Amino acid sequence: MLKTAVFTCFLCLSFLAVRAQQAVISGNIADSSEKQNLHLAVISLLRKSDTTIATYTRTNQQGKFVLPKVDTGLYFMLITYPRFADYLEPIEIRGNKDIGTVNMTLKSKLLEEVVIKTGSAIRIKGDTTEFVADSFKVKAGATVEDLLKKLPGFTVNSKGEIVAQGKRVDKVLVDGEEFFGDDPTMATQNISAKAVDRVQVFETKTEQQQLTGMSTGNEGKTVNIKLKEDAKKGAFGKLYAGTDFNKYYDSKLLYNRFVGKKKLSAFGTRTNVNAGSLNWEDRQKLGIENDFEFDELSGYYFSFGGNDDFNDWNLRGLPDAWTAGTLFSNKWNSDKHNVNLSYRFNRLGTTNVGTTMTQNNLPSGLTYSNRYTTKNALNQQHAVNAKYEWKLDSLTSFKIVAVYTGKTSHTIGKNNGEFLNGNRDSVNQSFNNYDNSTERNQIDNQFTYKQLFKKKNRQWQTVLRYGITDDNNSGLTNTRIRFFDSLGVYKNTDTTDQQKSFDGRSTTFGVKSTFTEPLSDRWMLVVDYAYNRNLSRSLRNTYEKGTNGKYEVLISEFSNNFQLDAFSHSGNAILRYNWKKIRFGLGSGVSTVKLGLDDLDNNNHSQFHFLNITPQAQFNYVPKPQTNIGINYRGTTRQPTINQLQPLRDNTDPLNEYKGNPDLKVGFNHGISIFFNQYKVLSQSWLGVNFSYNIQENAITQFNTIDLTTGKRTYYPVNVNGNHSWYLWSNYNKGKGDKKPRYGFGLNGNGNRFINFVNGQKVETNSNAVSLSLNFGIDADDKYDFSINPSVGYNASRSSLATGNNNNYFTYGGQVYAEVELPWKVEINSNVNFDLRQHINAFASNTNLVIWSAGITKKLFKKDAGKISFYANDLLDDNKGFTRTINSTFISDDRFQRISRYFLLKFEWSFNKMPGGEKK
């Protein structure tokens, strides 16, 4: 009896123990990308000891599952679902367990991610396209500029200016920092391609635009060069020198040193064969990066003779350029402090002889004008940039930017011209000599305070800025004009001998505060307020000689002295949505502008008031990885500048006299743009499309009055309706592998309808241009590289003044490049660029260009660190400067000097000293 009781008790305890060692497992199964629950997914438990199935179940319609009566122990959990990658995870069961949500991944997406991690050349994430540098083969000693030429969607011209995905690159960063201020060529033409890890390209946005998520639609592109980690240790640089031992020379020195997070760079160049871009854009606020907020008043301070060859050279004439600079940057205390200091000097001398032939389409018929110019110019610039950032903690930061720019320019030249009637009889002949000097000193300061909050995405930012600009310009002009009657017989001569001076000072102050508030995990509200003020004083006077031979007699009708007080208040409200595959923004801004203009000559006061509305909307959709679609709309007001509003007469060119119009209205522009980007990993193909369309209301154009008896033109600005423009860029590329062909094509176009007035008659011109380009290439590392890029274009222009004239023509262009590696480390290369265009009836001659250049290079030293080469530029001596312009009232061919055939013997040495690496 006792044994029976003990046995019964043992069985009960064993049963309870077994019951205690069983558990219930539950969870939820979902799609990782769509965040949707998966119905009927299979969940299996496999014993770890022998991988046999212990139990299994399926999910219900809500994606939930329960595995009851599971013995404790070690298992593998296997989850399967059609088209999804299997999920296998070890699991230890000790008691009841809820594993939460298991996100399953589509097999197609998983494959893409694996390929991306192991060998993808291109990645698209949001607005950023990233290129893995080592995926694109470049020759030894290549620069970043050479690398960019290999990337899909990039073009680089002879000045070093870059176009990426159809838009001009206006900023190049190195590891997120500017490299010598606002000269992008300093990075692209001097940093070695082998030092680059990745190249990123994205829309250029100010800090305010990054907060709002909205843009103007007219932004350019920013390129960020991310260096390899081993390239940021030690020192590297380049020494380059070339000469023909007679007339031409080209030299460059660059040194970079990294010590921890400290960076020191210095450079110097001297050349008369390629001055590069020097300074791509003389921004109104030089050097304040592209996150500087321009205000509504930027058009209200103007200067006489403000342009210079730093902006206008455009490969016209023969250059003689010097540049030098130094840069220091450092981050310390866990990157809480960041300083960036740089100095840059530019000196550019140019000489140019040019000819411009023009056919004028007037209501009364055709006339002709020819102009012959000679120009010598010397421009110099000193630019100092300083930036300091301080992150007080994870939520608060300050940034101070200070910039000084000093520029001087001296230009001497002469312009001779003639105006002919329809029978090509002389109406006038002009002879002009000028001597102009300009000086500008500019100081700009910006202070930024940024405050984050513990609530995610809540942010407050305030920007203060203060700037002073001083202009001092003077010029002498002597013009002699001979007039003829209708039969071409000489009548009389008119002479102008004047001195023009301009002294101006502008002081600007602005503040802008932006607050971002998350309304939910999907919605966000961004509001901002800005106040800007501009105080300007402009003294612009024209003098003629007195009896003592000095320029001291004031000509009041061509003089103007005024003081401007302009200020604006503006506000914006933007509602943003961001969830899964969709990003959306909608909002509007409103600003009021008041201009107070004091005429110091006549003691008059004028006021102008403008109301500006800027509605905007953006929509972005990511249907799948590596694909991006977007559409943007922005409405902007176009208010007249002071130079357009004030009734000042300008006779700098006596045959083309300008005067202002105080009755101008504010214009409005509707701009819409659409873009599409897609990269397919498996096929290594990339497609990009950008399209934009603009409609202008109350656009400001010109009212021209031409006196056919004298050939003199008087013009002033007026408002018109009906102007519009469009732009298309598209590019497809496939393949980038070693020894594998790469090919692609591009379809581009642009057009506009432009309205102005000539002798009281409204003139409408419709111009459209389309082009198709193909590209094919193949290369093998250190063996050969071949590419051919032909293009064909068609230009059509029709004016209501000359409906019978045919100004349509084809253009043919392209490039053929070949490079072959020979034994003994010898390399030969050949490059042919051609630009051919169809003849039009307006001109007897036509200009077609075929530019053939070639070189032979011998590699030297260890790791091919040195090179000696012989280079021949423009072997056919065919590099003639030429542009053609077709407008509503004229067709013009402009011919100018360019550097043509020359030969250079060049030596190049790239050096580096990296820890643990080899010295070169």
Regions found by a protein language model. Give the residues of each.
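Conserved C-terminal beta-signal and adjacent last beta-strands/turns
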Residues: 773-794, 806-920
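Short, ordered, surface-exposed loop/turn motifs in non-cytosolic proteins
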Residues: 33-48
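Membrane-proximal, glycine/serine-rich, low-complexity loop/turn segments characteristic
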Residues: 21, 62-64, 78, 82-85, ...
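A short, solvent-exposed loop/turn motif at the edges and junctions
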Residues: 46-52, 74-90
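Outer membrane beta-barrel strand-and-loop segments of large Gram-negative receptors
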Residues: 372, 508-510, 553-560, 665, ...
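Signature of Gram-negative outer-membrane beta-barrel scaffolds
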Residues: 498, 524-627, 800-805
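Short, acidic Ser/Thr/Gly-rich low-complexity loop/linker segments typical of extracellular
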Residues: 48-64
